[in-house]
Amino acid sequence: MAKVIGIDLGTTNSCVAVMEGSSAKVIENSEGMRTTPSMVAFTQDGERLVGQSAKRQAVTNPTNTLFAIKRLIGRSYDDPTTQKDKGMVPYDIVKAPNGDAWVEAHGEKYSPSQISAFILQKMKETAESYLGEKVEKAVITVPAYFNDAQRQATKDAGKIAGLEVLRIINEPTAAALAYGLDKKEGELIAVYDLGGGTFDVSILEIGDGVFEVKSTNGDTFLGGEDFDMRLVNYLADEFKKENGIDLRGDKLALQRLKEAAEKAKIELSSASQTEVNLPFITADASGPKHLTMKITRSKLEALVADLIQRTIDPCKAALKDAGVTAGQINEIVLVGGQSRMPKIREAVKQFFGKEPNMSVNPDEVVAMGAAIQAGVLQGDVKDVLLLDVTPLSLGIETLGGVFTRLIERNTTIPTKKAQTFSTAEDNQSAVTIRVFQGEREMAADNKLLGQFDLVGIPAAPRGVPQIEVAFDIDANGIVNVSAKDKATNKEQTIRIEASGGLSEADIEQMVKDAEAHAEEDKKRREEVETRNHAEALANATEKTLQENADKIGGDVKADVEAALEALRTALKEGSSEDIKAKMEALTQTSMKMGEALYKSAQAEAESEAAGGTDASGDDVVDADFEEVDDDKKDQDKSA
């Protein structure tokens, strides 16, 4: 049976794992790394780079290197968080025809689902390379606090990447799976997950194979990227005070600042002080400017104190929703790279009253949990029951713009709930069902997931028609809504897409584009390999010619030199097919050179052999000798 992989599609880094026997194994990528940067870049000549190769060239190509794309997935362009993000990244965020936030690189517009698909493709290829077989199915993780639009957009990304997404699983739940798979005793655990772009906290009861999520809370726009930006702004402000130049106006300088800030932040987790040193960061009329600044751990902690505090409020809400106190929590599991910061660990310890558990790798545990869930779905992992919850309340807009909840937050999923409504006016023949997700009392203050019309309601006074609205949330946390007129049994059903969202046609087109790109990438790789082989052949032939010029006949030498020159010209100007043809011609001509060298070597060997035979006669020296008889020998001895 083909393997199902587990993918942690992260804001900053992504990770892929697979079940091997009874345990999950993280797979190393082609660079030998266990995590892959969630970055996609488009070069000047149209090449697409993903992961480490994209990160390496980010400083020189900031406007076409896309990162932290997960913060845009499933969001509209007008969303305040999108507008905030525009000031944090050097690439362009644009408004799509459907109102969603998309990105632009080299004049091409891409949806966040497409960019995420390129990253998922890289993870898929990493797994295929390790397993030696095609991978077509996956379990993908998302922040627990992702709404329906964000979950659907992640599932779309999987489809574009050529993966059947068997399950969307919440990141803290995945981490709990990896942490608690071998725990037999009942435990109440808190998973504190602070990643690159999102924060989640989940309270779970685990033991004897049952993982029950009691509550979840979080902030989908709070993570390591925000910590980096605090340091970037501090460095930029200090530099401006000193030099009168705002580095944030220069995209290349901003990218260098961002990389330096991230590096400094990581170093300050183990050191009390570090130095940011960026020579030639900019220039003015007086000449080049350099940025050199010492940063202490206490300075960084002061810069991000409010961000750390922002993670504590969701912890309080999660405990309240679960009906437990901090003292009742047995273990606190830290997840996400940003959770390595000592001040964060201190804040968590202070809030929960105990040391957080450091036994799991915060960068890998989520992918491992996804692989375990994949194993459960495949039947390879037995006796594991996962009971997750919906993070936000779901409901519809009713008279006066009120948000009427049908499913409360932290309800165990999958779940189904129905409620009967009626018309607001006499003889109303149609109703518009507007579906929202959130916790505010007025519908307009929550996230509009979608809307649809139920038409053909028989004329009747207001309040008489019976319209049943049913919500159905599947195990992925994705919503289906139906409305039925009980009198006529007319029913209208929609699978919620983001109010913008990608249509099936959009997704199909993106799948085709991804496949075309895969072919393009394969062709490009083959072209590079052909050129490399051609260069190697040309160099080897040239070396042979130089070393054996006196042993090759004039005609053969002229033919080889002509074929070599033709290949060199093809390498400069020719197509891949032309290079292959010239390589073949040079190979054939070189065979004649080989024959000539062989004949020359054979002739030399024969000449040496013949010379050796003559020498045995010519070089012998005739010596005078006297024959002595035996009697004479005896006399000599006695003398």
Swiss-Prot record:
Species of origin: Parvibaculum lavamentivorans (strain DS-1 / DSM 13023 / NCIMB 13966)
Keyword ATP-binding listed: yes
Phosphothreonine modification, residue list: 198
Name assigned to this protein: Chaperone protein DnaK
UniProt keywords, alphabetically: ATP-binding, Chaperone, Nucleotide-binding, Phosphoprotein, Stress response
Task performed by this protein: Acts as a chaperone.
Domain of life: Bacteria
InterPro entries: ATPase_NBD, Chaperone_DnaK, Heat_shock_70_CS, HSP70_C_sf, HSP70_peptide-bd_sf, Hsp_70_fam
Sequence similarity: Belongs to the heat shock protein 70 family.
Protein encoded by which gene: dnaK
Sequence segments annotated as region (Disordered): 597-639
Pfam families, sorted: HSP70
Compositional bias of kind Basic and acidic residues: 630-639
Keyword Chaperone: yes
